[in-house]
């Protein structure tokens, strides 16, 4: 069957033909290719078209598709176990690995997704502090938990909606909105509500309004305010954890969070999530404390095995991060040079192996308001050109592009060649 026929039939059985909205390509006005296989950085659709992949399952596949060691670990465990709903040594192994290798995580609780991790961390913060209010930042996405679906970045921006139907005002009345990288605004917010704020949740490297790194003095301000008012600082490292550095985005700042959430890379490509922090806080979770959270598939042995294989490989090959940094810099520099050559207004934001090309004529993109000024129509033309040229990119101006250890200079150079063709066409259109 052709891709378009499969997608058309999918629309009869799944809302929008997909199980997560951005996959429908609605924002770029195209039909998505239907992917059937992947190895390394090459994925293949049902018509046997091949694409160089810069989405990598939205970030988890830092080792590339079907890494041999990860697949072998999955095979080995799946021959003995699928699920128990009981303690296993594998979950201890992964928990111990994370707690001994990361700075600020003394205890950890496994869950099944990034959304579960963030919503559970917020519940824990509320239970620990006995307060209700949570601060999130405009443009940051922390999953589809009701309390977060306000000013939530890519998912709702791409769909052209401010939030989500089905979320009553009561669900968000205790959510306060901060402005990313704005010290003065967050300080004023704390002056007004500080003694009611249970916690502040932030992507230290935002990825769902495009890639924007928190500024050092802004992060220090958050830490100081949380200390002053007795609130918890929660880092959402679902996307940045183990990606921008082995120890994640928190290693890029001289700031310690109280709680951290993980997913994506830590599951090796399988459904996974976790949240952790100081023992003093984590011991408030049931069965030790009064904050209840549970899950049938939490700590699933196959997922734990995939996570252990992935994280061990990253720890034992720290040069992987050097490689990703080098090819990322090559891609960034190439895009900037080509854009200047053809008078194409762009801003490139990159932190390690995650980056966003903003079609924006500002000098820098550092806030959600800056992101809103992007030329979405130009992005859509760029996306279509690159897809036809054999590149799988995020189908949204407001998402991150990802690199893996399997990307080579030849893949980057091929990308830049296709991008230059696009830039030339845009230049001709403007004449």
Curated annotation (Swiss-Prot):
It is an enzyme of class 5 (isomerase). Its EC number is 5.4.3.8. One of its GO terms (biological process) is protoporphyrinogen IX biosynthetic process. One of its GO terms (molecular function) is glutamate-1-semialdehyde 2,1-aminomutase activity. Its cofactor is pyridoxal 5'-phosphate. The modification N6-(pyridoxal phosphate)lysine is found at residue 264. GO terms for cellular component: cytoplasm. Homodimer. PANTHER family: GLUTAMATE-1-SEMIALDEHYDE 2,1-AMINOMUTASE (PTHR43713), GLUTAMATE-1-SEMIALDEHYDE 2,1-AMINOMUTASE 1, CHLOROPLASTIC-RELATED (PTHR43713:SF3). This is Glutamate-1-semialdehyde 2,1-aminomutase. It comes from Clostridium beijerinckii (strain ATCC 51743 / NCIMB 8052) (Clostridium acetobutylicum). The lineage of its organism: Bacteria, Bacillati, Bacillota, Clostridia, Eubacteriales.
């Amino acid at each position: 069957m052709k891709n378009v026929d499969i997608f058309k039939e999918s629309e009869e059985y799944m809302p929008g033909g997909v199980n997560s909205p951005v996959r429908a390509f609605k924002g770029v006005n195209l039909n998505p290719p239907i992917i059937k296989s992947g190895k390394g950085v090459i994925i293949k659709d049902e018509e046997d078209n091949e694409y160089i992949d810069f989405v990598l399952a939205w970030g988890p596949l830092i080792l590339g598709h079907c890494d041999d060691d990860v697949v072998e670990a999955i095979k080995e465990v799946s021959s003995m176990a699928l699920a128990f709903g009981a303690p296993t040594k594998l979950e201890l192994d992964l928990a111990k690995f994370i707690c001994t290798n990361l700075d600020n995580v003394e205890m950890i609780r496994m869950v099944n997704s990034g959304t579960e991790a963030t919503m559970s961390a917020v519940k824990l913060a509320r239970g620990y502090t006995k307060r209700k209010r949570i601060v999130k930042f405009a443009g940051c996405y922390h999953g589809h938990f009701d309390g977060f679906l306000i000013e939530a970045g890519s998912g709702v921006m791409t769909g052209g909606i401010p939030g989500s139907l089905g979320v009553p005002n009561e669900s968000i009345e205790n959510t306060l909105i901060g402005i990313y990288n704005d010290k003065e605004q967050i300080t004023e917010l704390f002056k007004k509500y500080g003694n009611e704020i249970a916690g502040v949740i932030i992507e230290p490297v935002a990825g769902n309004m495009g890639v924007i790194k928190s500024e050092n003095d802004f992060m220090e301000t958050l830490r100081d305010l949380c200390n002053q008012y007795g609130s918890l600082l929660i880092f959402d490292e679902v996307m940045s954890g183990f990606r921008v550095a082995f120890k994640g985005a928190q290693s890029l700042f001289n700031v310690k969070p109280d709680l951290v959430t993980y997913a994506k890379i830590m599951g090796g490509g399988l459904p996974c999530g976790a949240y952790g922090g100081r023992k003093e806080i984590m011991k408030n979770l049931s069965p030790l404390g009064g904050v209840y959270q549970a899950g049938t598939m939490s700590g699933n042995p196959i997922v734990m095995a995939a996570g252990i294989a992935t994280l061990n490989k990253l720890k034992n090959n720290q040069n992987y991060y050097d490689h990703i940094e080098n090819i990322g810099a090559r891609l960034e520099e190439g895009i900037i040079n080509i854009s200047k050559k053809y008078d194409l207004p762009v801003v490139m934001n990159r932190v390690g192996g995650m980056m966003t090309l903003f079609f924006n004529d500002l000098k820098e993109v550092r806030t959600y308001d800056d992101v809103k000024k992007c030329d979405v129509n130009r992005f859509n033309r760029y996306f279509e050109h690159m897809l036809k040229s054999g590149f799988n990119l995020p189908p949204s101006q407001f998402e991150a592009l990802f690199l893996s250890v399997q990307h080579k200079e030849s893949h980057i150079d091929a990308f830049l060649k296709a991008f230059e063709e696009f830039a030339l066409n845009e230049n001709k259109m403007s004449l």
